Amino acid sequence: MTKETIKLFSEMHAEPSWLSDLRQKAFDKIESLELPVIERVKFHRWNLGDGTITESEPSANVPDFTALDNHLKLVQVGTQTVFEQTPVELAEQGVVFTDFHSALEEIPELIEEFFMSSVKYDDDKLAAYHTAYFNSGAVLYIPDNVEIKKPIEGIFYQDSDSGVPFNKHILIIAGKNSKISYLERLESRGEGSAKATANITVEVIARSGAQVKFAAIDRLGENVTAYISRRGKLGNDASIDWAIGVMNEGNVVADFDSDLIGNGSHADLKVVALSSGRQVQGIDTRVTNYGCNSIGNILQHGVILEKATLTFNGIGHIIKGAKGADAQQESRVLMLSDQARSDANPILLIDENDVTAGHAASIGQVDPEDMYYLMSRGLDKATAERLVVRGFLGSVIVEIPVKEVRDEMIATIEEKLSKR
């Protein structure tokens, strides 16, 4: 793939010169940059991009929308937007939720200001690749002082019957003192068995006083090798409450970061992960405290089945000058097989004295006494294990503030466990 092909893609979509130029600069950097470091995860031989920038044809794998409620929603299959719904009262308040290139026409100044502002195009090889080759995406913009009570849904299907890379950029801009709940799904759809790649970046910009509840359920298929980056950038007194279910079937490296720029900003990152078969999932979860009295909490629990591998890296970094900051983390992994592999690595980097910080990490097998108790009550081994897993992950799931997300995450866990 050449720079000329990327330039032609930009021209075909009438992208502004600043974006076209950024793609070109990113392309030039790809070869010289290193892969991001995910501690104790070896993924340098994974195929995380084949250097193409193409679009999907209209797909047969389109779900039925006839029973949907009237709330803010966007659905894409591959690179195509197949459903878009914005209630009139929200449109009148200036709310925008549309595909990336349509948003470039509707709110160009905002996208130029915030696109790739929480992650830089030259941070590493995968960031540069993403900037050069992302082929679709979505933008959600909530103006200042707007509160949306119903959950907002963004559903993004990877079409397994298509060979088009799943390279998406999702940009969420929550204006000052706005308040939203957003649910995102990344899911494979179709019967195709061809190998596929995904490079997904989600940016959440929470401006001063904004309150964002962000939930995601990732269910990419076993033939998809993926890099998923979710980044939050928080202003003064802003908050992001993350709840992420990592339930993919293929190999995944993920980077979930919150930069607490503003004084009094607050981020909670709750992650539930389930690895099975022979898959490898490596997850970096990071909070960086820049602002005074900022608070960052990480709570992540994972379960490993069969011969799978799961790595949690929890990273809390308090920057010099962030007086009164607090960084806490807990990472725990439960293994249901003696052939499973796991790491849970707590990392604290503290450059300021007047702060609080703490961490906890554990890896273990199912408690035989728990299994004995459940099986003595007439449960078979598989059912008993499912109950133990639900209890182990439930301590994280119960902290998720949106009931619909809790219920869907539990159903997803049950579905994955039932495939054993």
Q: What kind of region is each of these model predictions?
A:
Residues 96-379, 393, 397-420:
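Conserved beta-strand/loop scaffold segments within soluble protein domains that form the structured core
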